[in-house]
A protein has these predicted regions:
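Gly/Ser/Thr-enriched, mixed-charge loops and adjacent short helices
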Residues: 56-173
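N-terminal small/polar loop signature for handling phosphorylated ligands or for N-terminal nucleophile
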Residues: 1-55, 134-173
Length: 173
């Protein structure tokens, strides 16, 4: 779902004259990092957050480090539905390798002295391509549970409050 929505969002933004820098598959903190690192004026991220499969939305923000509040999203919805937006010719640029830039930044700034064993349960969600690498990079011994990306979420929803996920973690601990 996310890929199709991402394409539509990019088409919509570029049709209003925006310059879109696509950093690829990411987590919310990575998007905020990218806004500062790439000196971007705004962010838009397609995310399901911790919703059930099929429930995807868009997180947006203009001020660095802040996302739109419900009132701002309502205003944006009205602008879109009433076609009260400007038209222009924007463009898109793929930022290759940004996942590695993000991981290296976190690893270089966060080393630990004491050995820590970390159980990482990602529910086959996006965190699985980040968390194990970052934690190993800072010096943790990582025990991975369901870290392979699989958008069908075969065992449980990747939500830290999901009881199946919590049970998997407690068994590993």
């Amino acid at each position: 779902y996310s890929e199709e929505i991402s394409e539509v969002v990019k088409i919509g933004l570029t049709s209003t004259g925006c310059f879109v820098e696509d950093i690829g598959l990411s987590l919310s903190p990575m998007v905020y990092f990218a806004q500062f690192n790439l000196d971007a004026d705004a962010i838009a991220m397609v995310t399901a957050s911790h919703n059930e499969n099929g429930w995807t939305g868009v997180k947006m923000g203009i001020k660095k480090g802040l996302t739109h509040a419900p009132e701002e999203m309502k205003e944006l919805k009205n602008i879109t539905l009433n076609k009260k937006f400007i038209e222009g010719k924007g463009s898109e640029k793929q930022i290759d390798g940004f996942q590695e830039v993000y991981k290296k930044n976190l690893i270089n700034k966060n080393k630990i002295d004491k050995k820590i064993r970390a159980v990482v349960a990602c529910g086959n969600g996006t965190a699985g391509i980040f968390a194990p690498d970052i934690l190993e990079g800072i010096g943790c011994e990582v025990i991975q549970i369901d870290c392979k990306l699989d958008y069908t979420f075969p065992k449980y929803n990747p939500n830290p409050e999901d009881l199946k996920m919590l049970n998997a973690i407690s068994k590993a601990v």
